[in-house]
From Swiss-Prot:
Its EC number is 3.4.11.-. Keywords: Aminopeptidase, Cobalt, Hydrolase, Metal-binding, Metalloprotease, Protease, Zinc. This is Aminopeptidase 2. Its cofactor is Co(2+); Zn(2+); Mg(2+). Pfam families: Peptidase_M29. Highly thermostable. It comes from the Bacteria. Gene3D superfamilies: Thermophilic metalloprotease (M29) (3.40.1830.10). It comes from Geobacillus stearothermophilus. Belongs to the peptidase M29 family.
Length: 413
């Protein structure tokens, strides 16, 4: 019997009932690495018991990904199986829920030409644009969770043997996702309620700008008019509540694509498609990255920024307290799902249309006029620390504290 059998049962239940919140008669689509097979079986069983009509799954294998990037001809990375793209669109149109299980090897493609990776990413993003638009507009319930793999566990706990490292990573995941509590679903209900109170507070404020102060120059982010803060649970267009990310500690909203100025430096490594980018700075002027540097992964960062015009602009600003459970673990996960919930972060690329009033019903032209960024990519990177202060600027120019020393500057009942 698996050492984590009880916890895996609870994790599967959390993914099905809180993550995607499967509804009677609904289809669930699961994308997962081969290493997640025991958990996927539990998820399928729980989904059917909860009323799912179908559970479809798609396996991925990093060894095959590695082989392709090293041996496939160049033209292979400019092609995408449109049969899969159409299948994803059809599932979305039919109201399916989508669960992705993410277990990255941060160094998988470190010796691959970054141009190959950039071409493959852009090709996939173009082919899956309609599906991703549906997901980012919350037309469907979707969720992202993670499971340990030997490569990932070794990156986080490099001083331990594989089995010990995997056990330590499972322990961290179960603690951070509240699986270690007696009733994880109730714990998540309480957590979502707390995040909702913060969201309500910030939505009522409707700050026109955020001012970031940490060691270094001031960094400013203008927010779009009619911006909407979100955090914790989301609501699909059919009215079903779901949690897109497990874990999540953030509240986030939409910057104006032309209203970002100053220089920011990352505070945690960014794992981007099998490569680590670290020690990097981005300098913005009138919303656009006009200069950048990186101590590690410079070419990968360059190709990311060159994806399209929107890749050099921000699509998301997110606030996460330094005292979050992920941060308090004192671990660097090299997995954005976890690391973004340890620190305030920004996202290059496409904005979530739900972060502006009536955004899901606006045309691309209307969204552009209102300052909403569009891109083939959406990549979060972490800038928060214990030294970070953030003020909100009201419409009449008054500055009010939001963060002090990396944590919330206000108390809510």
């Amino acid at each position: 019997m698996n050492r984590w059998e009880k916890e895996l049962d609870k994790y599967a239940e959390l993914a099905v009932k809180v993550g995607v919140n499967i509804q009677p008669g609904q289809t669930l689509f699961v994308n997962a690495p081969l290493e997640a097979a025991p958990l996927v079986r539990k998820i399928a069983k729980t989904a059917y018991e909860t009323g799912a009509k179908h559970v479809y799954f798609e396996w991925n294998d990093e060894a095959l990904t590695y082989i392709k990037f090293h041996h496939a001809p160049e033209e292979a990375f400019s092609e995408y199986p449109m049969l899969r793209a159409r299948a994803m669109e059809e599932l979305a149109e039919q109201g399916a829920a989508f669960l992705s299980i993410h277990a990255p090897n941060p160094d998988l493609l470190k010796d691959v030409d970054p141009k190959r990776i950039a071409t493959a990413n852009k090709t996939a993003a173009q082919a899956l644009a309609n599906y991703r638009s549906a997901i980012m507009a919350d037309r469907n319930c979707w969720s992202l969770i993670s499971v340990p793999t030997p490569a990932w566990a070794q990156k986080v706990f490099g001083d331990l043997r594989d089995e010990e490292a995997i056990d330590k990573l499972w322990e961290a995941i179960f603690r951070i996702t509240r699986i270690d509590q007696d009733d994880p679903i109730a714990a998540w209900r309480e957590h979502n309620d707390r995040l909702a109170r913060i969201v309500d507070y910030l939505n009522n404020k409707q700050y026109k700008q955020l001012v970031y102060e940490a060691p270094g120059p001031i960094f400013t982010v203008e927010l779009v008019d009619g911006h909407v803060w979100h955090g914790g649970a989301a609501t699909s267009q059919s009215g079903v509540r779901f949690n897109p990310n497990i874990p999540t500690e953030e509240v986030f909203t939409m910057p104006h694509k032309d209203g970002v100025n100053g220089t920011v430096r990352n505070t945690k490594p960014l794992n981007y498609n099998g490569n680590v980018i670290d020690g990097f700075t981005l300098t913005f002027k009138d919303g656009q990255v006009v200069d950048f540097s990186a101590e590690q992964g410079y070419e990968t960062l360059k190709h990311l920024l060159d994806t399209d015009d929107g890749a050099r602009r921000l699509g998301e600003v997110a606030l996460v307290p330094h005292q979050s459970p992920v941060s308090l673990s004192n671990l660097i996960f090299y997995n954005t799902l976890f690391d973004e919930n340890a620190a305030c972060h920004l996202a290059l690329g496409k904005a979530y249309p739900t972060n502006i009033e009536n955004g899901a019903s606006l045309s691309k032209e209307e969204l552009d006029r209102r300052g909403v960024n569009d891109s083939l990519v959406h990549v979060d990177f972490m800038i928060g620390s214990a030294d970070l202060n953030i003020d909100g600027v009201t419409k009449d120019g008054k500055r009010e504290p939001i963060f002090r020393s990396g944590n919330w500057a206000f108390e809510l009942a």
